[in-house]
Amino acid sequence: MVVKFTKSEALHKEALEHIVGGVNSPSRSFKAVGGGAPVAMERGKGAYFWDVDGNKYIDYLAAYGPIITGHAHPHITKAITTAAENGVLYGTPTALEVKFAKMLKEAMPALDKVRFVNSGTEAVMTTIRVARAYTGRTKIMKFAGCYHGHSDLVLVAAGSGPSTLGTPDSAGVPQSIAQEVITVPFNNVETLKEALDKWGHEVAAILVEPIVGNFGIVEPKPGFLEKVNELVHEAGALVIYDEVITAFRFMYGGAQDLLGVTPDLTALGKVIGGGLPIGAYGGKKEIMEQVAPLGPAYQAGTMAGNPASMASGIACLEVLQQEGLYEKLDELGAMLEKGILEQAEKHNIDITLNRLKGALTVYFTTNTIEDYDAAQDTDGEMFGKFFKLMLQEGINLAPSKYEAWFLTTEHTKEDIEYTIEAVGRAFAALANNK
């Protein structure tokens, strides 16, 4: 298959004249996969994309996770259309937001109270504010490599040591803010304990991806999350789960429900919006009552709880309640995993594959991936070549070695079979060019 990107290239050239970097999120650029014009999509339906040149793709990007029910799902599309016809924004309470809040609470028992915002970044940012208000402390802990949005406090990477006060990971983030963040490696209890022994009395909360999604799919070691809860609570701090990626991705509910570990606060986004902008946060009643108008922690938003996003979210959860959907995602994920591993062995390509149900990551390495350091130490150049080869095969992946492949409820066994064949051809090409 020879895929041409003439119109995408022309559109990107034009975009560079008007949009910073030609993209509205840096993750959409092809900088991490060797450069070039990113492919511009024109429409999506089910598990498929069509770009501006008319090329068709099987989509494993799923908009970085939200599109679990596939593109333009009729039930969700109808709900959005109805909401739009009734007016997309009121600036008042609505019945839709109450219904949606109840649905989230029923699905995730740790949510005594919830509040809607407009993005995962907002949700995480506000849980931090609430935790600080509740504890009277200022420092935050996070795990290296875990992305929690682009607000100043969480755009922090680890410094030179295994546990350290943070250094800014972006220009424009003051060192004074970064020093409020303590970064430790994921899946390492001893380093976490050392950091809490040193700074625990200053820590308001720890941010946790219960299943990591931002340096690939990485599961916690057995007992790790339970130990995090124990140590953090002993220090008098709160546990915040960032479930922006994980909630409703692996089961109807949160990763916390799948794993049986309960946080104090939870941040949500992505899947719960059915493809429209959304965020939410919630948790224990006594903590959430710190939020205005009941408490002193201020948070507001003109678009928060807007009818279109509420309707889309309700419809998405209604679809996900259908029997057998998550079992299908797991079955297709297992089929894809098996096929990719077989092709890697056949063509003598070194990979490690991490999968949980309908999400997986292919790393070009022989090492086990349990933390960010291991994920960094993988072959990004090889991934970039693989990514470009897969585009030529009509397979759309995220343009980064750190990102997951996301299955949707609309993928079929035939899609998986074709994808495995495409992986085989890509691996053969890589093997011939070693």
From Swiss-Prot:
InterPro entries referenced in this protein's UniProt entry, alphabetically: 4pyrrol_synth_GluAld_NH2Trfase (IPR004639), Aminotrans_3 (IPR005814), Aminotrans_3_PPA_site (IPR049704), PyrdxlP-dep_Trfase (IPR015424), PyrdxlP-dep_Trfase_major (IPR015421), PyrdxlP-dep_Trfase_small (IPR015422)
Catalytic activity: (S)-4-amino-5-oxopentanoate = 5-aminolevulinate
Cofactor(s) needed by this chain: pyridoxal 5'-phosphate
UniProt GO BP: protoporphyrinogen IX biosynthetic process
Modified residues (N6-(pyridoxal phosphate)lysine): K270
PROSITE patterns linked: AA_TRANSFER_CLASS_3
GO cellular component: cytoplasm
Keyword match Nucleotide-binding: no
Family named by the database record: Belongs to the class-III pyridoxal-phosphate-dependent aminotransferase family. HemL subfamily.
Protein name, as recorded: Glutamate-1-semialdehyde 2,1-aminomutase 1
Record organism: Bacillus cereus (strain AH187)
